Amino acid sequence: GLGDVYKRQQVKYLVEQGKLDGEEARREDYAGKVADSCYRYVLDVLERTRPVVKALSERYKLVLVSNFYGNIQTILKDFGLFDFFAGIIESSVVGVRKPDPAIYRLGVEAMGLPAENVLVVGDSFSKDVVPAKTVGCKVAWLKGEGWGNEEIDETLPDVIITDLPELLSYV
């Protein structure tokens, strides 16, 4: 777009003036392209999943349990998801991280329900499925490509889905 043309002109000018090294400019350009690509991916995912989260929030109390850095509320607001959650349990705020089952106990407490009446939806077998089951929750495993060579027992989750919209036919 026009913004990209303007940015390229700025970079070219800075290189010509000796204020920016050509290699540094290429790295910066590449980093910007990677960031833009990641951002577009997030927007694509949100387009598919926001309606699901909205529908679930209209029928159920939703609490987010996440290993994050103290700014997840801002991120959720920026992407129009904040209002769907009745509570947020963020690891850096509560001082406990997944896979410690204690973070799921905090989520269950925030729900105000017995653990067996809580459905945890998670994408990590070792950090979501195992600790949530340890606490006594039901679990929907959003199974994607694995992060490593963790041992997996596919009988442990109550349901296995590969795309979030599938969850609507389960609940």
Please give the residue ranges for each predicted region.
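Solvent-exposed, charged/polar functional surfaces in cytosolic regulatory/catalytic domains
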Residues: 13, 33, 37, 55, ...
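Asp-based, Mg2+/Mn2+-dependent phosphohydrolase catalytic module
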Residues: 25, 50, 54, 63-171
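Short, acidic loop-to-helix structural element flanking the phosphoryl-transfer center
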Residues: 35-63
